[in-house]
Amino acid sequence: MGNIDRPRRLHKVVITAPTAMPNSEQVRLRQLARDAYSLMCKDGVQRNPIDVCPAPESIEAQPIYNINGWRDWSYDEATACQLVYLFAEVQERYGGDARSLFDLRGKPRVDMAGKGFDGNVLTIGSIDVGAGTTDLMICSYGINAIGRVTPVPLFWDSFYLAGDDIMRSIVQNLILDGGARGDIKSGTISSVLQARLKTMTNEQFEQRLNNTNIESQRIDIVNILRASSDESRAVAIENYGYDLMFDYFGGDTANNSDKDRRCRVDFNSQISVPIASYMLQLFSDNRAQRDISFNDVFAKHKPAKYLLDHFRNHFGFSFEDIIWEYRPEKLAKEIRKIMTPLMEQLSILLHAFDVDIVMLAGRPTKLPALTDLFLKFYPVSPDRLIRLPEYEVGNWYPFSHGTGEITDQKTIVAVGAYIGYLASHGGGIRGFNLDMSYLAKEMGVTANYIGKYIPRNHRVDPTMFTPTNPTVNLHIDSFPFIFGCKQLDTPVYESRPLYVMEWIGQGNAPMDLTVMISRSFQDNKEKLIIEDAYDRQGGNHKSNIRLREQSLVDSQSGDGNCWLDNGSFKYLKK
């Protein structure tokens, strides 16, 4: 793919993005990269000029009626994954003859024939499950009049349900909470805590009473000491255990000091996530069930001592003593619980577009439970299902084993973008040429329907803005108000957050506020504008309200705080 004798100089930086990332964020991402390079050049050191691709101005949203406007391909991640597969198949298995591949694996399509692509075309449906988003791209590939392979997008979208959500579910239910074995060493933090509390004497509880100034915990301990029966004592102990868990993992409260908050965040990144990652790696490797010790997970990199001390001081026992249960069936259950609604929805879309090849990409697709879940809803013959984590891409790939398998899944998007750029500029790669004009022209934003966003189930309800309804008079009784968007107007379609509307005026917002909001579906369907805002007495409050772009909303807290950043789990409330 290159000349080893030629000095390497960086001339161009290609930046990819999730397939349906809001257009304003896509533009800003590339502009920030350009600004970063400009800032670096202020040190006076002579450097080669570097271009950012795609250029921010080349991917800005354009009015639907501007048919002559030029746009670049957005270098979306799902299409980049498809290009790795397509290039490998054409070059490694079909001797550079894309037509042979299309004739063997594809079929004629009426929608492609209408664009001038006669004969067989290959339609690939790819699901790229990343950490933060799951990207869908359904794309047909034909050969144009001058022999270039031409991708034509049929359907695309991004869903904010992915690997991080699987990780959170495992941390919540297999590491922090869940389980009631009654074992003082084996289980989850909650189950081990409850088992240990049940063995404590009144003298030990009295000592804890003297060592805590948290009122809720003091009340729990007093109830334990005053319990008139074994049953009431058991209930009081259970409540005390809940409060200990909530005060440590449940989010910011008046009981938390600054040290408590920092330790909760660090516990998440240094302890909880590494244990969950260790379990997922065992699951990916099809390991049998086993128990996991502290030294199994942290053999090389142990958590900071202050974290372990803080845990011991709060809960009364050493974290290092816990034995974790790795049970493959439990991990599979968590994966199914999180991903079933989305996999079912994606399967319907793949079936509707009658794809020839189904591709699963991203590290989570190495998990057998995720593939099994997909096949439950979309049965497909083995030769039509491509799992990129196991695909023999060939030795040309920069990050491959000697057998041609990809060693690092995170490189797939980068290599796919590299192929997309080189094959569509100049002379292509080894005779492999791409015409990206349809991708650039037709891949627009997907926010067809906008309405009130419900974080807990990723839904928009009710739908307010439609292609034919450009203006909404919204009655607001509380702030913030979150807007979400979706491509299809069906009740179960996965939606994503887009804006948050906030009160920025002095004092409290009026209880009954009417806000007039508009958007132009033809000009920029993602852009909302506040036209007017007034209260029941007719007072104008337009200047006191702000629409702020916000594409990340936590499904538990309902705000922009991510569990990976703050380590809190709202479900721990009683």
Question: Where do the PLM segments sit?
Answer:
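Phosphate/ATP-binding catalytic cores across multiple sugar-kinase/actin-like superfamilies
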Residues: M1-D5, Q82-K115, D309-V355, L370-L373
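Gly/Thr-rich phosphate-binding beta-strand-loop-beta motif of the actin/hexokinase/Hsp70
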Residues: V90-R148, L360, A417
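Terminal low-complexity/disordered tails
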Residues: K330, E334-F353, K366-A369, N448-K574
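Phosphate-binding glycine-rich/basic clefts of nucleotide- and phosphate-handling proteins
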Residues: T19, I138-N313, G420, G426-W503, ...
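Conserved phosphate-binding loops in N-terminal lobes of ATP-dependent enzymes
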Residues: M1-S24, R30-R34, K574
